Amino acid sequence: MKRKVFEMQNKPEIDAFDTRILAELQADARLSLAELGRRVHLSQPAVAERVRKLEAAGVITGYRATVNLAALGYGIRALVRVGRADFARMSRFIDESPEIVNAWNVTGEDSWILEIAVVDVEHLDAVVSQLCLLAETSTSIILKTLRQHQVMLPRVKHMKEAAA
C-alpha cells in the first residue's frame, strides 16, 4: 500500500529565518522591525526585506488587533450551523450582519458555519430567526475558548511515498 504525498502547491521558499519571523509575528504582530530582527538574529533591513517578500508571496496576508468581544458588550458567542442555502443570499446576509465574526462555507451536512457575537439571548434569537428564513440552522453557544489563533508554521517534512 502506498502513502499519498501531500505538498502545498506554489509553496514559496521559506527558510529557518522566515519560519522564525512568522512565529514571532503570529505571536505579536506589533513587534518593530528592529525588535523582530533582534529576536531572529538578522538586521532590521534584512528582516524588512523578508517580511516584504512574505507579504508579496501571500504568506502574510494582514495584521490585526485581537479584541475581547465581552469587553465590547458582546456577552455571548455562538456557532451557527446552516443547512443548504442560496449562496448569493447567504453571502449578502453575512455581509450585512455585523454580528457575524467569522463565516465558513463548508462541506458535509451543513453548508455554512458562522461564528456570531451578540449582546444577550434575545439578540441571539433575533439573528438566528433571520437565518432561519434562509435555511435550517443549529446553534451552539460557546462556553469557553481553549485555543485561539494557533501559531502555524511551514511544514518541515512532507509525507513521502512509502510501501506499507
Task: Tell me what each language-model feature is.
Residues M1-A164:
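A compositional/biophysical signature of low hydrophobicity enriched in polar/charged and small residues
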